[in-house]
């Protein structure tokens, strides 16, 4: 083997190459050290790493090429080796998790704000960013709503969903958008009694398996253990009329199972021969239809839609259903969410609860009304204070205290005019988030419905029939009821009442604060104010 290690810049002489005269060609040179005067010291020589020996070059050209049986183990020098398993299993971040994306979010008044988020940002993270920017109170009810105005569809994003992934599935150039608003019904299935969301007649296990277990225990097992019963009931399904080209509505008996959504072609039969498959739960999303009568001709106001994920635009492929009432629709929507996400929904609820408790423990208490559920009426007229237990006495004490406070405030801050106190008391409600000004009855019902038909959601608006009156719109049992508030004047003082003057309040703020603690003539307490937040 010959190694040519001589650099080009070194000179060689014939004496260095030829052997000494008289020495046989086969004889190697003597090992004795040369004389000191003829010593030649070696120099370090650079050897390229890609240099091949002549024998290797010859073998490489003479042997046939053999395919590599493990191509996944080899990679170009400029790339890192490919490791098996997903990035989540290895504890590493996804390759594009640091990629920044722009997400546009709209408020209920139509204002838009662009937010720069990471590619893996969840809906909960985006809501927290918007709450901080809007200087709003942070709670578990904030959410993002995926809205498709062209299709009249909308749904609330779950807290764990990726906002960027949802946005990338939208059609290019469409009018789809995210809306930032409160959704009080998001976790109501873990708060309210089970029979309010899942009626006994709609849970198949209660009717088919007489095991002795109560309906409430069955629903608790459904929510806690992840055992999925069958949801069933009559729904109207939109179909095409033969030869007419019109969309007709027909009533079918439907079943929601873990495997998908079905309807029976023969009455209430559950025979597999009579079941027609509609949609896969894991490959679809359920939406609320907002303008069903106008766009789809829905016979009632309680429509919902099952939209396959692969469907990007157009009405073709949408499965439009119509229920008889709001309770039935809420049951189908809640069951669909539970079947699709399972225990992840309960984890989201627990995380939201822990975040709320942590913020209330670490930070300052949120700004709220003077009235609070922890306050009680006290009487300090004697030598020692006592708790007022009589409701009528407590009401009179609260009214007297509120009037005294307002007299002090008006005397200190207002101008010395006789009607200044009256004007301040009459306009104090305009600064409250629950006051929506002059909106119609239908608009108030729409706003409350968008933020969740939960008991205690309310707003106050100006009356359109009575120029001097107001209306309290309140949700109870998934229905919005309206209560007229009329003003009255007694001895130069203005009062407001909902019961023909039997219970009078100096302003609307006092009326709302009182009914947050006492039902009065209302069917439930005022729990959640329907408010709009500007981004």
Curated annotation (Swiss-Prot):
Domain SH2: 434-530
UniProt entry keywords in alphabetical sequence: Cell junction, Cell membrane, Cell projection, Cytoplasm, Lipid-binding, Membrane, Phosphoprotein, Repressor, RNA-binding, SH2 domain
Coarse class of the protein's main subcellular location: cytoplasm
Topological category with respect to the lipid bilayer: Peripheral membrane protein
Residues covered by the PH domain: 228-341
Tissue-wise expression: Detected in liver, kidney and placenta, and at lower levels in lung.
Domain Ras-associating: 99-185
Compartments, as annotated in UniProt: Cytoplasm; Cell projection; Cell junction, Focal adhesion; Cell membrane
Bias (Low complexity): 1-20
Site entry (Important for lipid binding and for stimulation of cell migration), positions: 238
Assembly notes: Homodimer. Interacts (via SH2 domain) with EGFR, ERBB2, ERBB3 (when phosphorylated), ERBB4 (when phosphorylated), EPHB1, INSR, FGFR1, PDGFRA (tyrosine phosphorylated) and PDGFRB (tyrosine phosphorylated). Interacts with SHC1. Interacts with RND1. Interacts (when tyrosine phosphorylated) with FHL2 and HAX1. Interacts (via SH2 domain) with RET and PTK2/FAK1. Interacts (when not phosphorylated) with ELAVL1. In stressed cells, but not in normal cells, part of a complex that contains at least GRB7, PTK2/FAK1, STAU1, ELAVL1 and TIA1. Interacts (via SH2 domain) with KIT (phosphorylated).
Family per record: Belongs to the GRB7/10/14 family.
Annotated domain remarks: The PH domain mediates interaction with membranes containing phosphoinositides.
The protein's name: Growth factor receptor-bound protein 7
């Amino acid at each position: 083997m010959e190694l040519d290690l001589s650099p080009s810049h070194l000179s060689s002489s014939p004496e260095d190459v030829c052997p000494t005269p008289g020495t046989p060609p086969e004889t190697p040179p003597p090992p004795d050290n040369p004389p000191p005067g003829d010593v030649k010291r070696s120099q370090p020589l650079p050897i390229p790493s890609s240099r091949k020996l002549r024998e290797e070059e010859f073998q490489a050209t003479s042997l046939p090429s053999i395919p590599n049986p493990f191509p996944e183990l080899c990679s170009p020098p400029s790339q890192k080796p490919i490791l098996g398993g997903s990035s989540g299993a290895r504890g590493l971040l996804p390759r594009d998790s640091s990629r920044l994306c722009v997400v546009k979010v709209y408020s209920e008044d139509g204002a838009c704000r662009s937010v720069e988020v990471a590619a893996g940002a969840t809906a909960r993270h985006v809501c927290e960013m918007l709450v901080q920017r809007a200087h709003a109170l942070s709670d578990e009810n904030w959410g993002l709503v995926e809205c498709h105005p062209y299709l009249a569809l909308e749904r609330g994003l779950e807290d764990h969903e990726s906002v960027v992934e949802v946005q990338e599935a939208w059609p290019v150039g469409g009018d789809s958008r995210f809306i930032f608003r409160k959704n009080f019904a998001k976790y109501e299935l873990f708060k309210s009694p089970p029979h309010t969301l899942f009626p006994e007649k709609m849970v198949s296990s209660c009717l088919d398996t007489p095991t002795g277990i109560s309906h409430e225990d069955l629903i608790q097992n459904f929510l806690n253990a992840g055992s999925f019963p069958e949801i069933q009931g009559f729904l109207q399904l939109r179909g095409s009329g033969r030869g007419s080209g019109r969309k007709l509505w027909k009533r079918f008996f439907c079943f929601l199972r873990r495997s998908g959504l079905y309807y029976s072609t023969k009455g209430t039969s559950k025979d597999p021969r009579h079941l027609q498959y509609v949609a896969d739960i894991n490959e679809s999303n359920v939406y609320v239809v907002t303008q069903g009568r106008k766009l789809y001709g829905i016979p009632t106001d309680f429509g919902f839609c099952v939209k396959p994920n692969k469907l990007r635009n157009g009405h073709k492929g949408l499965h439009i259903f119509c229920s008889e009432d709001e309770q039935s629709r809420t049951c189908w929507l809640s069951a669909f969410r539970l079947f699709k996400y399972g225990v992840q929904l309960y984890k989201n609820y627990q995380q939201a609860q822990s975040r709320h408790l942590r913020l209330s423990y670490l930070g300052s208490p949120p700004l709220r009304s003077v009235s609070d559920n922890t306050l009680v009426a006290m009487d300090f007229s004697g030598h020692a204070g006592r708790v007022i237990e009589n409701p009528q006495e407590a009401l009179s004490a609260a009214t007297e205290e509120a009037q005294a406070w307002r007299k002090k405030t008006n005397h200190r801050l207002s101008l010395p005019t006789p009607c200044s106190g009256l004007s301040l008391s009459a306009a104090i409600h305009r600064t409250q988030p629950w006051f929506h000004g002059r909106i119609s009855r239908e608009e108030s019902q729409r706003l409350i419905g968008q933020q969740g038909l939960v008991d205690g959601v309310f707003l106050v608006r100006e009356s359109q029939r009575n120029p001097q009156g107001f209306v309290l719109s309140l949700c109870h049992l998934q229905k919005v009821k309206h209560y007229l508030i009329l003003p009255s004047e007694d001895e130069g003082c203005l009062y407001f009442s909902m019961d023909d003057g039997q219970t009078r309040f100096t302003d609307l703020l006092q009326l709302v604060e009182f009914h947050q603690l006492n039902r009065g003539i209302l069917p439930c307490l005022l729990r959640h104010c329907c408010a709009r937040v500007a981004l």
